[in-house]
Amino acid sequence: MLDRLHTKDQAACGREASAMNAKTPLLALLLTAPLALLARADGGTSALPNAPTADQALAAKYVYGLLSDSRYAYRPRALDDALSQDMYKRYLESLDPAKQFFTAQDIARFDAYKNKLDDAIKSGELDPAYAIFATFQQRVNERVKFARALLNQDIFVFTGTDRYEYDREDVPWSADNAALDTLWKQSVRNDWLRLKLAGKKPDEIRKTLDKRYNNMGKGFAELKGEDVFQAFVNSYANAIDPHTDYFTPRAAENFNQSMSLSLEGIGAQLQKQDDVVAIREIIPGGPASRSNKLQPGDRIVAVGQGESGVMEDVIGWRIDDVVAKIRGTKGSKVRLDVVPVEAGIDSKPNRIVLTRDKIKLEEQAAKSKVLTIPAGNGAPAKRIGVIELPGFYQDFEGRRKNADDYASATRDVSRLLTQLTAQKVDGVVLDLRNNGGGSLTEAIELTGLFIDRGPVVQVRESGGRVSVEGDSDTGIAWEGPLAVLINRGSASASEIFAGAIQDYGRGLIIGETSFGKGTVQNLVDLDRWPANEEPRFGQVKLTIAQFFRVSGGSTQNKGVVPDIAFPVSVDASEYGESTYDNALPWTRI
């Protein structure tokens, strides 16, 4: 995300933030790919409160104040009946995305709230959200009981022509409980068949599915009132744009840990995708990246500890529970059964063994190598220097203290360019594939290694003011032929750099169209106004600006289109900014 992070003790004295440390005393811009984060704040099992708390009622009003005010939100939206209907739809989708718990009769009853959720946010009277959730929890209990009972029935003979529609996003709600019974019978039979095709025996299948359904019920039973509140307020926040989010106090406390959690274990960021956990992003330098066997969109269906032994089915699990299984002691082994992104969910998974590790800074640093490319017709071979840059990193504290050896992507690339020049390479390829971004300053200064001063990016704020950020240093570190390699995982800072190189005609952009995220987010602490010693209200991440290329066009949605396109590795319709239904449109200034 291109995020301007902001905490209650900060001063407006800078414009970058570390991807390793989301909280910083600097007014910061974090240019990384979007990270989906909506998980239970802790593992508690206390009963769900019957009503929201007084602090939650106040927090809802504070969120409304931010998201409806053009001084804060880049694209404020009036909280009216139209937005209430959008919230209603999103809240139901967040609870029951596969339409497997609620009936059409339930929805007809909930429709009384359709035009009232805006009033609930404004007034802090949040009972409608809790009432809907109470019904949801009841329906989950009913379905879990029904599914477990089916496992002991003689329904697992597959000689007919039954069909089960796995993707239920566009199907209507089941008319009543009888229709849901039919749906769940098909679903359980499908789950059984998938395990049978994977080679499991009936007793093993029965045990696996019984545990899966029981875990699903327990997971929902453990949800707390703050989980309900966060999901409901996010139905409002996400209706504004896909990168606007609300975090409860506990979720906000864990927000800073979320990046480091992903950096231990296998080095991958995960997200929930229907009833499975999928890989959202591969962290450079980690076990997943080094294995070259995983990619964004791959789905994890089972986890095993050690090099051999039992594989634990994790379909239907909460994302935090799956993460807990994947993480472990550095040096230990973890096995994953993974269904590739391009395969159907019913496909046989691949077994991948990874050694858990913690990513070291040096493993994320820029690296170079020289490739010798044969030339035809008796011409001499070409020597091409390849620089791999996994992130636009910077040691912000070291830079602030003016340390001589602080970590910096630009400084490292400059050093590598000097070495490659000494090795008399004929051209340079800068590899930004799966580079999710990092520091805006680094993106600008890195561009300056290849151009002799000039604008690099334009930033338009919510009030319409446009600032131009550019390279002011004279001199070029590399004047020879340049190519920049990108793919769908190249986002934000990578897109700023690649776009500038393309706009200046300084080099060729090759690969795939990039991610397409061209917005700026700000993390606002809701406790900064009451100046609470203990957090009570949480935080809001909201979009406050949009960035534009030197040529005036945005990277939003469209991304950076390569001059020379390679066959795509990830379906653009499944991954990227354009997959969000309410992403900001492309525009230019």
Task: Please give the residue ranges for each predicted region.
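Bacterial N-terminal signal peptides that target proteins for export
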Residues: K8-D9, C13-L27
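Bacterial N-terminal signal peptides
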Residues: A28-A36
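Cleft-lining beta-strand/loop regions that shape enzyme active-site pockets
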Residues: T45-P52, S70-D80, S84, K218-G225, ...
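Sec-exported extracytoplasmic/periplasmic mature domains
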Residues: Y64-R75, Y88-Q100, N115-L126, A134-N152, ...
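PDZ/PDZ-like domain segments forming the peptide/carboxylate-binding groove
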Residues: E93-S94, N115, A129, A134-K145, ...
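Extended, domain-scale alpha-helical bundle/helix-rich regions
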Residues: E142-G265, D274
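Conserved functional hotspot residues or short segments at active or partner-binding sites
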Residues: A198-K211, V550-I589
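Polar, glycine-rich mid-to-C-terminal structural blocks
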Residues: G505, I510-Y575
